[in-house]
């Protein structure tokens, strides 16, 4: 008969093996979409957008019609052409692909459609951030991350409002017009959606609203 100590060690060994198996499954769940991601074309929005519209609509190469719009909550008589640090913008979208996460942030407009928008003011959310955002919670930040995958929500991603319509809501607090990454008082910038790190080179969800900053 096995001694109590041996039974304990055997039980700990089984527990360790189970935990290792779970860790491998979770890691595969996270890494597989990144490894299998491939470019899916353009969002259909041209780089040159006239004026400072509060909404844009474009049909991507994937056949989805996406709409992006913004409401400046304290706009008074201003619009997106005269932003100041601390402005709060409620950003909404529809028609997005809910199987791929997106970042929402103020980023430099790229020189070509096949280039990634950025750098972005304040950077983009990182996977080192902890905390599931409660459904319906309003938390303003320089950038938001929207991803329905439960694993990424553990790192602070928001969920889509409606997967069927590809609808989301993000809450952006405008940072200073310049940081160590980009100076939006000198460069063309926009309030962007773009695919998150699970599909970084896929440009099909790159939509933006041009922004400017008050002098």
Give a label for each model feature:
Residues 2-215:
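Extracytoplasmic/secretory-pathway segments with low complexity and glycosylation-like composition
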């Amino acid at each position: 008969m096995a001694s109590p100590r041996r039974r304990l060690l055997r039980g700990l060994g089984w527990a360790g093996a189970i935990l290792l198996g779970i860790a491998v499954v979770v890691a595969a769940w996270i890494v597989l979409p990144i490894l299998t991601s491939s470019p899916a074309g353009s969002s259909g929005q041209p780089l040159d957008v006239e004026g400072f519209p509060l909404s844009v609509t474009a049909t991507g190469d994937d056949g989805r019609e996406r709409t992006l719009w913004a409401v400046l909550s304290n706009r008074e008589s201003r619009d997106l052409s005269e932003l100041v640090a601390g402005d709060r913008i409620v950003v909404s979208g529809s028609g997005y692909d809910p199987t791929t996460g997106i970042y929402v942030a103020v980023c430099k407009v790229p020189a070509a459609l096949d280039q990634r928008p950025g750098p972005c003011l304040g950077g983009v959310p990182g996977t080192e951030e902890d905390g599931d955002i409660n459904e319906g919670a309003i938390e303003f930040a320089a950038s938001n991350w929207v991803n329905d995958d439960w694993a990424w929500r553990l790192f602070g991603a928001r969920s889509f409002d409606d997967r069927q319509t590809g609808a989301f809501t993000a809450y952006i607090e405008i940072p200073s017009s310049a940081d160590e990454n980009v100076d939006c008082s000198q460069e063309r910038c926009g309030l962007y959606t773009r695919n998150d790190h699970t599909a970084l080179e896929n440009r099909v969800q790159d939509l933006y609203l041009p922004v400017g900053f008050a002098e």
